[in-house]
């Protein structure tokens, strides 16, 4: 029995702002159903006595050295920008005035 319907995939696509065709909805419904089936199998595994871990690796907060290196000039960085304003990238407003 299917665990996820085509309508549920369409709803998820709307939430993610994805425009999916009918064939994509059908395809993704099948793929997500298979994934949920695998998750169901994993949930049946007996993990009694297995210590919970958040990260199996012992490396914590590994950073690269903070070394100054050559980079682009402001002009080079803005050269391919479609729109600039006073030496900055200009992008469309996404939030209203009150926000």
Swiss-Prot record:
It holds the Pfam family GatC. It is an enzyme of class 6 (ligase). It catalyses: L-glutamyl-tRNA(Gln) + L-glutamine + ATP + H2O = L-glutaminyl-tRNA(Gln) + L-glutamate + ADP + phosphate + H(+); L-aspartyl-tRNA(Asn) + L-glutamine + ATP + H2O = L-asparaginyl-tRNA(Asn) + L-glutamate + ADP + phosphate + 2 H(+). The keyword Ligase applies. One of its GO terms (biological process) is glutaminyl-tRNAGln biosynthesis via transamidation. Heterotrimer of A, B and C subunits. Belongs to the GatC family. HAMAP family: GatC. This is Aspartyl/glutamyl-tRNA(Asn/Gln) amidotransferase subunit C. It comes from Mycolicibacterium vanbaalenii (strain DSM 7251 / JCM 13017 / BCRC 16820 / KCTC 9966 / NRRL B-24157 / PYR-1). The gene is gatC.
């Amino acid at each position: 029995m299917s665990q996820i319907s085509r309508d549920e995939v369409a709803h998820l696509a709307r939430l993610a702002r994805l425009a999916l065709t009918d064939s994509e909805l059908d395809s993704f419904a099948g793929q997500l159903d298979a994934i949920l089936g695998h998750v169901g199998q994993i949930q049946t595994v007996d993990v009694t006595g297995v210590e919970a871990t958040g990260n199996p690796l012992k490396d914590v907060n590994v950073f690269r050295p903070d070394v100054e290196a050559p980079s682009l000039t402001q002009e080079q960085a803005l050269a391919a920008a479609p729109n600039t304003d006073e030496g900055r990238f200009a992008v469309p407003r996404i939030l209203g005035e009150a926000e």
